[in-house]
Amino acid sequence: DHRDLHSFPTRRSSDLPMQKNYVQEILSIIHSGLPKAELAEKLSDYHEKDLADALEALTPAERQSLYSILGVDTVAEIFAYLDDAEPYLKELPSHEAAKVISNMDSDDAVDALEDLDDTDKNEIVNKLDKDSVEDVKMLLSYDEDEIGSRMTTNYISIKNDMTIRQAMSELVKQAGENDNISTLYVVDENEHFYGAIDLKDLIIARAEESLESLIVRSYPYVTDREQVSDCIDRIVDYAERSLPVLNDAGKLVGIITSSDVVELVDDEMGDDYAKLGGLTGKIGRAHV
C-alpha cells in the first residue's frame, strides 16, 4: 500500500506506553542459576536485540556460557545486532567465531567482520563453511561506498520457465534459509535478471496460470558498483521492501532491503536529516 503516510491516523508519542527495557530482566534470568534447558526456554522469549544489549553487562566467562546455552543459530542472530562485534568475536576461538559468522546473513557477517583487523578477519574467513565463504568474500570485495558492499544475498530466486507449482515448491525450499520472501526475483537460464513477482500474487495464482503473467518485467534495480550517494534517493523513492542488485552483465547478485536503506540514509544523510526530510517515512511505507 503506497498511500501517503499522512492519510493514516497517528497517535501522539505522549499517548503511547513507554518502551520497556528488558536488559535487567535478561540479566536476572542469566544470573538465576536455573538449569540450562529452562534458561534457554526463558531467554527465547526475548528479542535478539535485547539479548545483544545485555552482553556488555556480562563477564567473558558468562558470555561463553550463554553462547553454549543458546546455540550458534541464536548467537548469530544476536551478533547481527551488535554495533561493534570485534570484542565479542575476539573472545571466541577463530573456529567458533567462524561458526557464528557462517550462520549470519551475508551482509550482517560482513558488517561484523569489518570491525576486525585484517589478520583476524582473514583467519575467520578462511574457516567459514563453503556455503558462506563465497558470498562473504564477494561482499568484502566491494568498496564501502559501493552498493554491493551494502547488499545481502538473502533472497528468493526462481527461474522464468517454471510453472506456478514449481515456483511454489522452490519458494518453500528456499524460504527456510531466507528471511526476505515478500518479493521473488526471477532469472533466466543464464542467471540474468528477468523480473520480480510479489509473493501474494504467487500464492493466489491458479496452477494453470503461466508464471510469465505474474512477472513484473520492468522492475526497478540498482547495480553493484554504483556509489551509494548516487542512488540512495532513487532507492528511497521506490519505497519497496527490497530492490535487486545487478552486476555489469545484468546478473542478479543480491538485493538491498528496506532495513539496509534505513542504514544507508543514516550513514549518508544523518538520522536527523532523514527524519526532517520524511525519508524514513517513505521507507516505512514498504512494510505497509
Residue ranges: model-predicted function:
Residues 12-13, 185, 283:
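Compositionally biased non-globular segments, especially hydrophobic aliphatic-rich helices
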Residues 16-276:
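Hydrophobic packing positions in regular secondary-structure scaffolds
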Residues 1-13, 287:
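Short, small-residue-biased leader/transition segments that mark boundaries at the very start
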Residues 279-285:
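Cytosolic juxtamembrane amphipathic/interface segments immediately preceding
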